[in-house]
Amino acid sequence: MKASMFLALAGLALLFVVCYASESEEKEFSNELLSSVLAVDDNSKGEERECLGFGKGCNPSNDQCCKSSNLVCSRKHRRCKYEIGK
């Protein structure tokens, strides 16, 4: 009787440890996943801030308009505009 009670308690303790370990791994995984998603969002925001969009004020000597969108800084208007013909 004492042996069976001891085995039952040991089994419950082992089950508790295994469940707790798997639950903490799931939490770590979800935290890592969430932090990686947020890191991707932060990187995309950083890229958006590096260049100026259409119609934004700019300095022709330091052209910061988005080259990927074919924008250049107009010397006349000092605004980002689309470059036509290139």
Swiss-Prot record:
Q: What is its main location?
A: secreted
Q: Which Pfam families match?
A: Toxin_12
Propeptide position ranges: 22-49
* Presence of keyword Signal: yes
Print the keywords alphabetically.
Amidation, Disulfide bond, Ion channel impairing toxin, Knottin, Neurotoxin, Presynaptic neurotoxin, Secreted, Signal, Toxin, Voltage-gated sodium channel impairing toxin
UniProt xrefs under SUPFAM superfamilies: omega toxin-like
Q: In which tissues or organs does this protein occur?
A: Expressed by the venom gland.
> What InterPro entries does its record include?
Huwentoxin-1
Q: What family does the database annotate?
A: Belongs to the neurotoxin 10 (Hwtx-1) family. 22 (Htx-4) subfamily.
Query: What's in the domain note?
Result: The presence of a 'disulfide through disulfide knot' structurally defines this protein as a knottin.
**What is the name of this protein?**
Mu-theraphotoxin-Hhn1c
The taxonomy runs: Eukaryota, Metazoa, Ecdysozoa, Arthropoda, Chelicerata
